[in-house]
A protein has these predicted regions:
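Aromatic-rich peripheral "rim/lid" segments of glycoside hydrolase catalytic domains that contact
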Residues: 27-30, 34, 81, 88, ...
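Acidic-and-aromatic substrate-binding clefts and catalytic sites of carbohydrate-active enzymes
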Residues: 26, 47-58, 77-90, 117, ...
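Short, acidic/polar
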Residues: 50-65, 138-146, 224-235, 261, ...
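Bacterial Sec-dependent N-terminal signal peptides
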Residues: 1-24, 371
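Substrate-binding cleft and catalytic face of glycoside hydrolase catalytic domains
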Residues: 31-32, 64-82, 90-213, 217-219, ...
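Non-catalytic cap/lid and distal C-terminal segments of serine-dependent acyl enzymes
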Residues: 377, 390, 397-425, 430-720
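Structural preference for beta-strand elements that scaffold enzyme active sites
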Residues: 41-45, 68-70, 105-107, 154-158, ...
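Noncatalytic carbohydrate-binding groove/subsite architecture in carbohydrate-active enzymes
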Residues: 30, 37-42, 49, 54-56, ...
Length: 720
């Protein structure tokens, strides 16, 4: 029994990438990393532990991607001097030496923090609290010792961390005074906010050339943002050498909002010239405190929609950061991989997984399109031509952007399966009325696109759009108007054929099957016509070519313009959807060959006025339908005289034993599918004496606009 291998089948189902890379071609590893793609924007750093800088594979990952390093914990006060005069330099020195050996600048972290500090600085040898002067002397000694030891490799320091209070800053009814903006740490209780100024003064004394940062989490929260702003402004007005603000960036897929992040950058840039994102990770939940501790654990499968939210959050954030490259000068990921993360692998926080392999989000961050960062979207949106009656959304504009509106006030997330560079979809954002809005990150390819909504993990159709069968389900559809759409438009002055449904018996499957038959305007039941058997792709059915593909309108217009001979088109279900990803080890095309050749062709010849000869019969198919076409035409060369593969592979001269056995071969794909292979195959066939034509649809991929144009190009060569 003849079979199509599952490997080949998978290639066809994902043919956009297949054609782009070329069949049989081994993947080429990209030698560039974050530091290369962001060289014109900011340095990209990573927080490391001692294992990261001693394991060869992890070292290679660091050297490829990062041009700034932070010691995650090994330069904190308690790590370096847990007791007065007792210094632990081993790990910090190893990390510093790694940076020296590899010429990677080091971010110093951190000189003064409420946690992981040295409590001995606050008490004497009898346990009594010391004066603030004694505390300052100890703090100065620590800062000078550390800064001087590493000043040759450290280019900046997080001097003071997390000195500001959390909360929204509002005064509760029972409070006599407004809440204190400062964290009630031992430092603050002993010294007030003077300890902040002193720490910066001590660091600047030790290294006047180092950039000095105040660093805090929740720095995009509007209330805390203002507290940080006011404190830093107060310090700078007093002459304290605060050079920059560090926004830690411990975010989650639901927040903070893009608007709050950008507003914080803009506000901070009023008082500092440099902003670093110092501790970036994005977890997949909103848990804090004990709940966050509980959610750590063994890495578990992450639902696809959560991965999309994760990618979108990182993509949105980096777009904002690139937009503010004038002030954002460093972005540091807080750990190398999920395995190292303080959040745990189960929270999925970083671009590298627990095995140090890049996730899809790695490529989302790295392979950005600079043209889209500051793109100006024209506000000339109009309802899609494929909307339900009276539905305003979805919309599209003259540039090819699509905009969506969904009412789901109780939902936590809404994703449209279009956009994000083909990497998952467009994440919508909820307004104050519970309505979700979103616009694709960039223009869509011209033509028809399937899509659906994912609301909190549940897949539903867009109530505003009409439905079309694709992806083995009824999907929503949207049409991005093409510059050349005239060839498939309904025209009042053009005679129209008809599409009729037929039910034909299939003894081989013990069922009655359905086909749609396009009859040209000239069909009157007297004259006989040639026939094209035209197949859909995986996930579709016999409705695809006349609904999504507009095959009937394309033919009407071409016939009216005298561009091709009138012929019949037969469209039936190719039995492709019995194949499931990861399921069967192969696809048996022999069953469909029997249905098509031995049952449908005789039925059509018996019930319609056809020229029942090989040279007046053609078979073509798109994507997986092209695979079927290739297999059946080679298996039954006595049946079809013309072959067409539309994003469905190629023929070679070795396949065609006798050039006279075939009247013509048409090969096509989208211009984004790697057309060189198609064009070369067509030229090779022609050199072998076969009448062959190759075509690449400009600016499209593995999609219906490619196949509409392919039919337009193929039809004139048929039945000559």
């Amino acid at each position: 029994m003849k079979k199509i291998s599952m490997i080949a089948l998978t290639l066809m189902m994902g043919a956009a990438s297949v054609f782009a890379q070329g069949w049989g071609r081994p993947p080429v590893e990209d030698p560039t990393g974050y530091k290369d793609t962001y060289k014109d924007y900011f340095t990209v750093g990573v927080a490391v532990n001692i294992n990261n800088v001693t394991d060869p594979d992890q070292i290679a990952l660091i050297k490829k991607n990062f041009n700034s390093i932070t010691a995650e914990n090994d330069m904190k006060v308690v790590s370096l001097q847990p007791r007065e005069g007792e210094w632990n330099w081993e790990n910090a020195d190893k990390i510093a030496n790694f940076c020296r050996e590899n010429n990677i600048p080091l971010r110093g972290h951190t000189l003064c923090r409420h946690s992981q500090f040295a409590d001995w600085m606050f008490v004497d040898d009898k346990g009594n609290e010391v004066s603030k002067e004694a505390f300052y002397e100890r703090l100065r000694n620590h800062i000078h010792t550390v800064v001087n030891r590493y000043k040759d490799i450290v280019y900046c320091w997080d001097v003071v961390n997390e000195a500001m209070a959390d909360g929204d800053g509002r005064q509760s009814p029972w409070m006599r005074t407004e809440p204190n903006p400062y964290r009630q740490s031992r430092h603050y209780k002993l010294c007030g906010d003077e300890f902040i100024a002193k720490a910066f003064e001590f660091a600047h004394e030790a290294d006047p050339n180092a950039l000095l940062f105040y660093n805090d989490y929740n720095a995009a929260d509007p209330a805390k943002r203002d507290r940080i702003y006011n404190m830093v402004k107060k310090m700078k007005d007093a002459g304290v050498p605060v050079h920059g603000i560090g926004m830690q960036g411990h975010y989650n897929i639901y927040g903070p909002s893009n608007e709050d992040i950008e507003a914080a950058i803009v506000k901070y840039s009023e008082i500092v010239d440099v902003i670093h994102f110092t501790e970036l990770d994005i977890r997949i939940n909103e848990e804090m405190g004990g709940g966050l501790q509980f959610s750590r654990g063994k890495e578990a499968p992450v639902p696809a929609y959560i991965q999309t939210l994760h990618q979108a959050k990182y993509a949105d954030l980096f777009k904002i950061l690139r937009r503010h490259k004038d002030v954002v000068k460093n972005v540091t990921f807080w750990n190398l991989s999920d395995k190292d993360s303080w959040l745990g692998a189960n929270n999925y926080p970083l671009p590298f997984d627990k095995d140090y392999k890049p996730k899809a989000v790695y490529r989302t961050i790295k392979n950005f399109d600079p043209a889209l960062d500051n793109a100006v979207i024209k506000e000339d949106f109009v309802p899609s031509v494929m909307n339900q009656p009276q539905a305003e959304y979805p919309m599209d504009n003259s540039q090819g952007y699509a905009r969506f509106r969904v009412e789901a006030p109780q939902a936590q997330s809404v994703i449209v399966s279009l956009g994000l560079g083909g990497q998952g979809g467009t994440v919508l954002h909820k307004d104050e009325n519970g309505v979700w809005w979103g616009t694709t990150d960039g223009p869509m390819d011209e033509g028809f696109h399937y899509y659906h909504l994912t609301i909190d993990g549940g897949v539903v159709n867009d109530p505003g759009a009409k439905n079309y069968y694709g992806s083995v389900r009824w999907e929503s559809g949207i049409e991005i108007p093409a510059h050349d759409l005239d060839f498939y438009q309904v025209k009042n002055d053009v005679p129209h054929g008809q599409v009729v449904q037929v039910l034909f018996p299939s003894p081989s499957t013990n069922s009655t099957k359905r086909a749609f038959v396009y009859l040209p305007p000239q069909y009157n039941g007297k004259k006989k016509f040639p026939v094209l058997y035209l197949q859909h792709g995986w996930g579709e059915d016999e409705t695809a070519w006349h609904n999504q593909g507009h095959a009937n309108l394309i033919m009407d217009n071409m016939i009216a313009e005298g561009k091709c001979e009138p012929f019949i088109i037969v469209m039936t279900y190719g039995m492709t959807n019995d194949v499931k990803f990861g399921g069967l080890g192969g696809f048996n095309f022999k069953d469909f060959e029997t249905v098509l050749v031995d049952e449908l062709v005789p039925y059509i010849d018996a019930n319609f006025k056809t020229i029942a000869k090989k040279d007046s019969r053609a078979m073509a198919g798109l994507s997986m339908g092209g695979m079927e076409t290739r297999a059946i035409t080679l298996a039954r060369p006595e049946v079809f005289g013309y072959y067409g593969l539309l994003s469905g592979g190629t023929y070679s001269p070795e396949d065609i034993k006798d050039p006279s056995q075939v009247k013509g071969i048409f090969l096509s794909c989208g211009g984004k599918e790697g057309p060189d292979m198609i064009m070369k195959a067509a030229e090779t066939l022609k050199a072998a004496g076969v009448n062959a034509k190759g075509y690449a649809s400009p600016g499209t991929g593995h999609e219906f606009q490619t196949w509409r144009r392919s039919l337009l190009e193929m039809a004139p060569m048929l039945f000559k």
